[in-house]
């Protein structure tokens, strides 16, 4: 989406620190939760010196984080539109929920007059009771926290602002029609299957050709285009560790 918007002359700024680092370095993410985990702080320091004018050679993570925060705050203040995804959506209330540890969703949606949220249809849970279960599962499996630092609920826009929710199919209905693979849509994007996978842990996210790496990416790539992404299957060791740790019980190794 970023490339399409930029091709239309729209300035796109990632607000998640990891994604922002990758955007400025023109790199793809290597992990679904920690996208820039493969980047050394020395590389980040060099990039921020070039892009933000930070102190040369300063690789202190706190210093670099504060510099990025200051830079992003200016972007937030002058943004015309905020775009977010959604970790979950609640059918009974009509709200979406965005989970972050940086507060970038709150800050990013507070100043612009328009908020556009895009989400896959599999993100919908029936009610707030179910939401409580899934937010705890996501945080525990994704980062080992009881809950993310920020769990933001969006139901209606503030007065004078706009809020649009776009629910995406993009092949999900085709997966629903396949009984052997329907549970793949249970994925909450916690990244636990990547963290436990012996192949991913040794080869990294760039060794996969589908844009989502790891065991869940192998499955999704094969469902999307088996001819194009069949080479990823060789990255499975059949140890089934991914199936054992998956919080939503996707039998990734059996898929």
PLM features per residue range, with description:
Residues 1-180:
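The feature marks the mature, well-folded catalytic cores of soluble enzymes
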Residues 74, 119, 123, 185, ...:
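Conserved aromatic-histidine-acidic binding/catalytic patches
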Residues 187, 191-194:
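Phosphate-binding glycine-rich loops and their immediate beta-loop-alpha structural context
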Residues 11, 193, 242:
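Residue-level detector of anion-binding/catalytic polar loops
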Residues 160-184, 200-255:
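Ferredoxin-type iron-sulfur electron-transfer modules in oxidoreductases and energy-metabolism complexes
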Residues 86, 95, 192, 215-218:
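Gly/Ser/Thr-rich helix-start
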